[in-house]
């Protein structure tokens, strides 16, 4: 899906931050996160949504019913790629794994960065190297300074 939709988003001048497909029974949700240095407004989401809808109608990559949602990643932005983990080093994060790692699935702490294919997070003075392929969901924890 990334290969199909990212070029459309980027051609409009936005960054395709990530794509989620959430299967919810008979009706699913396709969520596309877009970003821009100047921020994202509702008009930006509408513009991208119209273009993506056209591509999805032609290519028809999803056989079931779904809703398309285009939005900003927001303050609690999800992290999808190693590059994003590198860019967000120094932020507080919440990470959920697909399966336990060192006896746990949930980690909340300081994102240190990336080493090889591992995300480095400091939790209670212990540094964990979490394999990227084990990460189910990761989000920035917003700061309100």
UniProtKB/Swiss-Prot annotation:
**GO cellular-component term (any):** cytosol
Subcellular localization, as worded in the UniProt entry: Cytoplasm
Pfam families from the UniProt entry: DUF150_C, RimP_N
Q: Which UniProt keywords apply?
A: Cytoplasm, Ribosome biogenesis
Gene Ontology biological-process entries: ribosomal small subunit assembly; translation
RNA-binding as a keyword of this entry, yes or no, is no
The reply to whether Zinc figures as a keyword in the UniProt entry is no
Recorded family membership: Belongs to the RimP family.
Q: What does this protein do?
A: Required for maturation of 30S ribosomal subunits.
Protein name, per record: Ribosome maturation factor RimP
Species of provenance: Azotobacter vinelandii (strain DJ / ATCC BAA-1303)
* Gene name as annotated: rimP
